[in-house]
From Swiss-Prot:
Superkingdom to which the source organism belongs: Bacteria
Required cofactor names: Zn(2+)
Extent of motif 'HIGH' region: 60-70
Record-given protein name: Isoleucine--tRNA ligase
Species of origin: Nostoc sp. (strain PCC 7120 / SAG 25.82 / UTEX 2576)
Gene: ileS
InterPro entries named in the record: aa-tRNA-synth_I_CS, aa-tRNA-synth_Ia, Anticodon_Ile_BEm, Ile-tRNA-ligase, Ile-tRNA-ligase_type1, Ile-tRNA_ligase, M/V/L/I-tRNA-synth_anticd-bd, Rossmann-like_a/b/a_fold
Amino acid sequence: MTETGSYKDTVNLPKTNFDMRANAIKREPEIQKFWEENKIFESLSQNNPGELFILHDGPPYANGSLHIGHALNKILKDIINRYQLLQGRKVRYVPGWDCHGLPIELKVLQNLKSAERQNLTPLQLRQKAKEFALATVDNQRQNFKRYGVWGDWDNPYLTLKPEYEAAQIGVFGQMVLKGYIYRGLKPVHWSPSSKTALAEAELEYPEGHTSRSIYAAFPVTSFAEAAKPLLGEYLPDLGVAIWTTTPWTIPGNLAVAVNGDLNYSLVEVSRIGAETQSNFKYLIVAADLVERLAATISAQLTVKATFKGKELEHTTYRHPLFDRESPVVVGGDYITTESGTGLVHTAPGHGQEDYVVGLRYGLPILAPVDDNGDFTQEAGQFAGLNVLGEGNQAVIDALTAAGSLLKEEAYAHKYPYDWRTKKPTIFRATEQWFASVEGFRDEALKAIAAVKWIPAQGENRITPMVAERSDWCISRQRSWGVPIPVFYDEETGEPLLNEETINYVQAIIAEKGSDAWWELSVAELLPESYRNNGRSYRRGTDTMDVWFDSGSSWASVVKQRPELRYPADMYLEGSDQHRGWFQSSLLTSVSVNGIAPYKTVLTHGFVLDEQGRKMSKSEGNVVDPAIIINGGKDQKKEPPYGADVMRLWASSVDYTGDVRLGGNIIKQLNDVRGKIRNTARFLLGSLYDFDPEKNAVQFEEMPQLDKYMLHRIREVFEEVTEAFESFQFFRFFQTVQNFCVVDLSNFYLDVAKDRLYISAPDAFRRRSCQTVIHIALENLARAIAPVLCHTAEDIWQYLPYKTPYKSVFEAGWVQVEEKWHNPELAEFWQQLRQLRTDVNKVLEQARVEKMIGSSLEAKALIYVKDANSRKAIATLNPEVGNGVDELRYLFLTSQVELLDSADKLQDGKYTSQSDSWGIGVVNAEGQKCDRCWNYSTHVGESAEHPLLCERCVPALAGEF
């Protein structure tokens, strides 16, 4: 053959139908269908040989569409579950939903006309709420499945299912029997706009809240014996100065609290420009705050005496607006000199610390405010006024009239609002049901210490929360929830709540669901013995806090389902759950069983936009997971990337803090997926005629380069394993990306093309390379499978040879061999790779200046400065080599000359010098081979193939 180009059909070019484009919008659903039809998840979770692995799902709330925070959470869970499956464990994952509570009630009410709303019975509201919750669950379930999340989607747990509610009542019943549940008056966060008590987790603290704060003085009427000698002479013109940001609570004042260890001063008041004249010649105030108070009330304050706070204990004062005397009491460390006067107005019905101090001193719990936030008759002249509006003003006016007000000023601070209605809340004592945390606090703290927290600071967050928390108010004044199964004696109001009544109600709810509490008569809900015992009962109308619902899931799901195991291996949620689900689950589990319901707790941060700002509709910076997957209205601007890109993002971020996401980040991650697909496509294409059973080369026989590559493969996949084991998925992301681009594309595969294309199909140099490629490809598919689950399966389905596994997930985790480990060889090849990089720079220079087109048109001149290195590198430039471990193949040049002195570099037109070596480039010698495009002085020597070189002639004969 003497025609140029007539040999192009004799080279082994890659062949595969694996698509370079992901085409995820079509391909991902096909792959999910393949998993479903073949029941891959079900069979692995039943038949894997390893231990059980139970990641218990924290239930998202069934009241709207999924947002990117849901996606991050469920994808992180799925990455862990899929990794555990690949490791051979029996992963049982039951997704769940939180279905009760006020937000769902509000959604239902918002959709009704006001006339319908007025006449709604609790049962009708519950029916509508249930329909809404179930519709939301279905919508969210379809979306979660589209993310590629595996789980028991046909049998999820819903907090509204009868078996769930019954188990929850069982937890409540056990806590009752252990004496942890009680009823009491207690100040709770009360929302007048929702007319219900709110949990801490249902509050938010918006920026920009301003209160009307007042300084006032209450007239002192007597001192304790010990203080009389020092302070007695200043009566009756003496007042205790207090400061409050909630003047409406003054009618509930029953004490003034001081810090026993602080210094206080008695000061004489002389007004400078008397704007408000008060009745007091003398005031008591914290010593450190005298100057600040003087400036605030525009008066001159002269210190007459100084003493410790504890000396004021048992002093009495008269309430400025009501005819009653109250004590000065010693409070706690919450009384500081950071603001106010150092004396704290104390209303046990309107504040947590006030309540605790009140209990200690036996003060009544007074809260003259009703459900709407209006003063009751107990508030006398203020009855009927709203405490957050005209009631507040009326109290300030009355204090002014009584000569008690010292100063009023606006005060900006954090104030709790109802997270749903966005309106301010109040602290108000109401009859509520409580779980006494005091009874098992120490056990709870012990349980926390026995859990593994990831990141570790999670333990430092939840520990003080549990150590300092007050008793848990578990009752809510709503109808959409699990009822507190209590009856009240119609005559005495005494609650009826015991083992017999609880078990009876539990059995009814297990059969009929919690609607029965509203549907059945009281007689039907009571055990026989209480039906005709001469008393009549009414049922309670409170439901349980939804945190008690979800906090019982360890009992309703993990313990109750036979395929699961309690305690669960892991809980994984956002870091806001230290005060939410992690804590409510811990408290119920410890109180009933004395242990935490989880062995490990992993938390992640929130998703912010690319600038690190909170996502909000008003900012227009919300990233919708559905749009990432399916694309937006304008598919040019918002293309459909599919679920794998979103999953790749979840693996790329350091989730231990807040994470960022936006259009640019997603685009970059799409490029990374593209690089991984491209690498996989080349690997697949290079194996079209390879059967590992027949063609694989033994490790011992391999050339150095291939042994080095297997060392790298072992190193890379051990690093990836370590990343998954330690839940540091960003390390997986960086390692795999680097391996595909730096080790494979830019190095090994670049060098391999000559071996793969030019050699005879069955040549040793080609089969050895294919063996490495087959190992790299199968391990790459397995390693990306927890994250890029669709891409990994796609690769596996296109393997050109038979494998015993129909899915990559059946193939198990990566497989590397100990014998591949060879640090000395690796060190030598690292040095060669550095040399290759430097040679490429010089070749590039020659290419830019048009001295050469392709690097094969060049001959490289190398001078290695260190004699030992020179000797070692010389072994890779033999007269006759093995066709692999040769510098010419490494550099992709037609020839390489190793120089014994630096002088000869002068021959090269382009040169570079470093500490280790000098490099030059000259034109290659000989003619260009028409088949492999290498230059050789032997082209033309074969009569049969005059256009070919000394490698291609034997290659065509099957000998190279």
